[in-house]
A protein has these predicted regions:
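A conserved beta-strand element that flanks and buttresses the S-adenosyl-L-methionine
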Residues: 149-150
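A short, conserved alpha-helix within the catalytic core of class I
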Residues: 157-170
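Conserved beta-strand signature within the Rossmann-like core of class I S-adenosyl-L-methionine
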Residues: 173-186
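Short, glycine-/aromatic-enriched active-site segment of Class I SAM-dependent methyltransferases
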Residues: 186-202
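Core SAM-dependent methyltransferase catalytic element
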Residues: 237-262
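Short alpha-helix
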Residues: 201-231
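Rossmann-like AdoMet
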Residues: 1-84, 88-130, 143
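Short amphipathic alpha-helix with an adjacent loop that forms part of the alpha/beta core around
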Residues: 135-144
Length: 262
């Protein structure tokens, strides 16, 4: 019997993103996410809008390609690390990665209740049912391991104060940490809508120009580098290899920003 899921607002967007990954994995195959395929097959949910929303699909897949590459490389250089995946939704990256000692998936209680049904996790993969703005640091048991925090698909639904609060929680808990955080350009926040996301009453509310501008808002973190989602788009749409060289395209593309705690 299929699982009927009832969510609304930002939490419901996780159903759109996992559908995009499942569809790509079972179709064109630029990513391989068998867990996503399994989960979508278990759900009683109308994915009609997600099926038609090509912009959302392309963005999710591009982001997955780039973040998988960055995470794999970081874990290779930091064996035995702790990973905290903030706003995890139904993300399945923990099943595609190796080399970590403990992976924590964190999201709102209503979201984690759904995840627990579909992806019951234990051992080296744990679930934390808390807001990203709550003081969740005490849930992380390891003391001296390298730390990677991933914040994917979240900041564009928050306020500047919310984003600063999340980084304050990270800074309070960890002496050293690397953060991969996805951001949206402010111009895109004001003008762009994804059909399937908008239908869930989830609205884009905040953006930042680039990684250097983000670091200026944070007292305990320094900017390391940033990656445009065009890098991921180029994998399945080669024209983006050219477009990515144009500053106007890079500027409006979502960024994956790398920061380190100082």
């Amino acid at each position: 019997m299929k699982e009927k899921i009832k969510l609304s607002g930002v939490p419901e967007t996780m159903l759109q993103t996992i559908y995009a990954r499942a569809k790509e994995s079972g179709g064109r195959g630029t990513i391989h996410d068998t867990k996503a395929e399994e989960i979508v097959g278990k759900l009683d949910y109308d994915f009609t809008l997600a099926e038609k929303d090509t912009a959302m699909h392309s963005g999710v897949i591009a982001r997955t390609i780039v973040l998988d590459r960055l995470t794999k490389a970081w874990l290779s250089a930091h064996p035995g690390a702790v990973v905290v995946n903030i706003a995890c939704g139904l993300d399945t990256r923990c099943y595609r990665m190796k080399g970590f000692c403990h992976w924590y998936n964190l999201d709102l209680p209503e979201t984690m209740a759904v995840r627990e049904k579909l992806l019951p996790e234990s051992g080296t993969i744990s679930q934390i049912a808390m807001s990203a703005m709550d003081d969740w640091g005490g849930e992380i048991k390891e003391q001296n391991a390298p730390v990677l925090v991933v914040i994917e698909g979240l900041t564009m639904y928050l306020s500047e104060a919310d984003v600063q609060r999340i980084f304050a929680v990270i800074a309070k808990r960890f002496c050293q940490a690397t953060v991969f955080v996805e951001t949206m350009n402010p111009m895109v926040v004001k003008r762009f809508k994804e059909k399937s996301i908008d239908a869930n009453n989830a609205k884009f509310t905040w953006g930042v120009k680039n990684g250097e501008a983000l670091a200026e808002l944070l007292t305990d973190f320094r900017f390391v580098e940033e990656h445009s989602l065009c890098e991921g788009m180029a994998v399945f749409a080669p024209v983006y290899k050219v477009l990515d060289k144009l500053s106007i395209v890079r500027n409006i593309s979502n960024k994956l920003i790398v920061l380190e705690k100082v």
